[in-house]
Amino acid sequence: MSKTTNWVGQNLTLTIEKVAHGGIFVARHDGRVVFVSHVLPGEKVLAQVYEDRGGSFCRAEPIQIIEPSGDRVPQVWKQAGPQGAGGAEFGHIKLARQRELKADVLEEALDRMAGIKLRPVVEAAPGDDEANGLGYRTRLQLHVDEAGTVGPYRERSHEVIKVKDLPLAVEDLRELEMHNKNFQNVKKIELAASSTGQVQWKIDSKLKGDER
């Protein structure tokens, strides 16, 4: 293992091995695990380390896909991806491959936590393929900045992004166009849509003395 104790800012050439929990992927470099987002198993990438607290692992994001996977597609939410809006961690992957990767994560968790040897099957719900992985989320958590802008956080930050749409949400939530509204003295807005089209709201107000 390298004597380097902090790799932040370093560019590493990596071959991605497998998926991990949370929509990130695993590579190894110089005896350490490197967790990388927005990649695919089998890809060769150039990635920059952005977090290293010492120990056996660090975290990086891709800056160049040297050898892309055949399962890579353009990000379905154009404002997501590296340094973009969080929440579309698999948006760059073909739907069939997404399901395989989710089954991989579940299989590993069952084995590790319960000792169960089982290969799960993740199947498409009716209409999923036609929707291209969009319009499925029945819950949204949006944040509000000091100017009243409503939107998701930028990946790995508490910066609210002004987005043009919320394409992962079901139509009952999208049509509210929360991202086009302005809220004062509000920290967070949570929305949930039922199967009958009803929408529940929860608004967290910003109280005096709250430093967020």
Positions of predicted regions on the chain:
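Accessory RNA-recognition modules of RNA-modification enzymes
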Residues: 1-212
